[in-house]
Structures are given as structure tokens and as C-alpha cells.
Design a protein with these regions (language model features):
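Alpha-helix N-cap and coil->helix boundary residues
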Residues: 64, 119, 140, 196, ...
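Hydrophobic or amphipathic, alpha-helical segments that drive membrane association/targeting
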Residues: 1-94, 142-199, 223-227, 277-281
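Active-site-flanking alpha-helical
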Residues: 52, 116, 120, 129-134, ...
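Active-site recognition of the HExxH zinc-binding catalytic motif
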Residues: 45, 107, 122-130, 134, ...
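Catalytic Zn2+-binding segment of zinc metalloproteases
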Residues: 128-144, 156, 213
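Intramembrane catalytic core of multi-pass membrane enzymes that act on lipidic substrates
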Residues: 73, 78, 91-92, 105, ...
Length: 281
């Protein structure tokens, strides 16, 4: 985890040094791109509510869900987040928000119908761990320069098309190459960080409930059910894959190769090991 951030830091310093050496005046573009990604983080709960179609629900409508979230949040010193439900048969859950004081936990109607109370509690524990660890902030900061690099590559490409000056065109090519390499390496490192955060949230959620087996059972149920959901339904929620406890992907999807989440089998194996370590066998 720390090594990933060190590599990212070195990469970004080299990237900016090359731009400075070439005398590229892309600072305004970098500022704009950074502002956009930080605004996305600041309004993350509202953006996700809008894109997911999640609806904030009251305690009267979902008493059991509210009780689980309130109890676990109080037990772990976390302010109770807003509670939302997404009307889809895809079984899943996610958390978002810029801080523990401004956060949201959402579950789908599919997961409410699939899991028993203990399994649902384990999933909620996983999501509350994301909130407690400020994972949205961590991944946002890690993503800033990768977003800047992407915009610079696009800007350099379109700027190069319009330029007829050979020197300018040569500089543009260098900028595009450096920006693309930065983006690719950042992309891979950010996914490594994300997978680490998922393992950490599994451990944290299991520790919250004291029952790693239930989270393992929930993950297996969710992934198993996902294979039986119509493709159209899966595709309708894939924009939320980075947030979901398990990405909504078909089993043979090439997207699994670049997933933000570790394979379910490995997560389950680690949870079973955690159970052994807790002396539950």
C-alpha cells in the first residue's frame, strides 16, 4: 500500500518534471482537471445517488436495515450514515461520501431479498469500514494525477493535429507519450490500491461483526446470484462497479482482468483464514 503511493509520487514528479523541462504551459489545464476530480469527491454522495437511482429511505420503511446500520455505526464510533435502497434485482451494496460525517450506505433490493440478517450485517460492516477508513478520499487523491494525465494526453493529441510547426509537433508527441505512460501506470497502481482497500474492508467488516464466515457466505451468495441475473440488468448498474462490494460483471468478462476488486475466491479464502485466527474453528 505505502509502496504504491511512493511509486505514484515518483511517477507524478517525473511527469511534471518532463512538462516543466519542455516548457509546456499546461498548468491551467492541470488545475481545471484537479478541480473537477476534487469536486467529484466533494459531491460524491449526491452524484452516486443520482447515477444509481438510489432513494434515501426512512426507518419506518426499512426498520431492520436502519437498525443494523445504526448499531454497527454506534459500536464503532462512526456517525450513522444516510441509508438508501436501489431498486434492482442485482444483489449488491456500496458506501460513498466525502467523510464519515457526510456518508451514505446503499443496498439493492436484490441483496435484501438474498441474504439473511447475519450476512446482511456482515456486508454492512464491510461498507462501514470503507467509510471509517475514508477510502473514497484515498482513491480520489490517488486518481487526481491519472485524470490530469488523461486530459493532457487528449489536449496534446488535438493540439498536435492543429499544429503545423515541426518543433511544436515533436514536443506534442513527447507530451502525449509521457501522459499516456503516466496514465497507464497510474491506472494499474490505483487498481492495486483499490483491491487492497477491499481486502482491508473485508477484514474490518468481519472484525465489526466478529463473524468472518458470514461475510464469506454473503460474498459467495452475491457472486453466485450475479451469474443468474439477465445481462441487461447487470449492464444497467455497471457504472457503480467501483463502489460495489462485488462488481457487476459476467463471469467471463475481460473487465475482470482490470477489476478494482480482488477475485471472490481469494477474498473468501482470506476470511476463512481470519476465522481460524479468531479461534472459531
Amino acid at each position: 500500500m505505502i509502496l504504491s503511493f511512493i511509486i505514484l509520487g515518483i511517477l507524478y514528479v517525473l511527469f511534471l518534471s518532463v512538462l516543466h523541462y519542455l516548457g509546456i504551459g499546461y498548468i491551467p489545464l492541470a488545475i481545471i482537471a484537479s478541480a473537477m476530480i476534487l469536486a467529484q469527491w466533494y459531491f460524491s454522495d449526491k452524484i452516486v445517488l443520482w447515477t444509481s437511482g438510489a432513494k434515501i429511505v426512512s426507518k419506518d420503511d426499512y426498520p431492520k436495515l436502519h437498525e443494523i446500520i445504526e448499531r454497527l455505526a454506534s459500536k464503532n464510533g462512526i456517525p450513522k450514515p444516510k441509508v438508501a435502497v436501489v431498486n434492482t434485482q442485482v444483489p449488491n451494496a456500496f458506501a460513498t461520501g466525502k467523510s464519515p460525517k457526510s456518508s451514505l450506505v446503499a443496498v439493492t433490493s436484490g441483496i435484501l431479498n438474498l441474504l439473511d440478517d447475519d450476512e446482511l450485517e456482515a456486508v454492512i460492516g464491510h461498507e462501514l469500514t470503507h467509510i471509517r477508513s475514508r477510502d473514497i478520499l484515498v482513491l480520489t487523491l490517488a486518481s487526481v494525477f491519472s485524470t490530469v494525465a488523461w486530459y493532457l494526453a487528449q489536449f496534446g493529441f488535438f493540439g498536435g493535429i492543429q499544429s503545423r510547426n515541426r518543433d511544436s509537433a515533436g514536443t506534442t508527441v513527447i507530451v502525449i507519450v509521457v501522459a499516456v505512460v503516466t496514465w497507464i501506470v497510474s491506472f494499474l497502481i490505483i487498481r492495486a490500491i483499490s483491491r487492497y482497500r477491499e481486502y482491508a474492508a473485508d477484514r474490518g467488516g468481519a472484525a465489526m461483526t466478529g463473524n468472518p464466515d458470514k461475510l464469506a457466505d454473503a460474498l459467495l451468495k452475491i457472486s453466485g446470484k450475479m451469474n443468474n441475473i439477465p445481462t441487461k440488468e447487470i449492464e444497467s448498474v455497471q457504472k457503480l462497479n467501483a463502489f460495489f462490494i462485488i462488481p457487476a460483471l459476467s463471469g467471463n468478462s475481460i473487465a475482470n482482468l482490470f477489476s478494482t476488486h480482488p477475485p471472490v475466491e481469494k477474498r473468501v479464502a482470506k476470511l476463512r483464514e481470519m476465522k481460524t485466527g479468531m479461534g472459531q474453528l
